[in-house]
Amino acid sequence: MGYPELLRVLGEEAAREAREVRAAADRECARILSEARAAADGARAAVLARVREESEAHRRASREAIALERERALLVERRRQLERLRLEALARLRGAGGPALDAALLAELLPEAGDGPLEVIVDPGAEAEVGRALASLDPAVAARAAVRAAPEARGGVALVAGRRVLDDTLPSRLDRAWTVLEAEVARLLFGEG
């Protein structure tokens, strides 16, 4: 084998080795590219999943906030309607007083009156009737009691005995009853419970 033949064989060998190195480099490049694509696809899928979860959480929070605001507005409206009903009942009660009612309420209060001087506060114009009712219920109490008119009609009577004020007016009775009955009234009006 001569020098030219040796050069040719060495050239072929170098070309073959170069092809093998290029093929190995191409395979390694394809492997690295495939791994990079798989990693990018995984990262993209993870980011998309997280974005979907965050978006769903945001939508859920928005729906809950809207529902909460709707419930709050409904509660405010129901409270407003209940208060309007209470005020309407109060207005009707103010005109419901009369001598018979005043006498009945006075009879309930007298046992709690005590022994000192008394002041009986009644609707304007009802002083004489209540004075007569008081005298017929208990003349001794009537002797130590002063009957005076309230600034405005409210229905019922109030009894002042020293520092104690025994309020048996219709608005006072409504206030006491309202705390007990408000839930039942709401249930009847709004179908709750």
Curated annotation (Swiss-Prot):
Source domain of life is Bacteria
Name a single GO biological process: proton motive force-driven plasma membrane ATP synthesis
Instruction: Give one GO molecular function term.
Output: proton-transporting ATPase activity, rotational mechanism
Mind telling me which GO cellular component terms the entry cites?
proton-transporting two-sector ATPase complex, catalytic domain
Q: Which UniProt keywords apply?
A: ATP synthesis, Hydrogen ion transport, Ion transport, Transport
Matching entries from InterPro entries are given as:
ATPase_E_C, ATPase_V1_Esu
The protein's matches in HAMAP family, at most eight in alphabetical order, are given as:
ATP_synth_E_arch (MF_00311)
Q: What is this protein for, i.e. what is its function?
A: Produces ATP from ADP in the presence of a proton gradient across the membrane.
**Which family does the record claim for this protein?**
Belongs to the V-ATPase E subunit family.
What is this protein called in UniProt? V-type ATP synthase subunit E
Give the encoding gene's name.
atpE
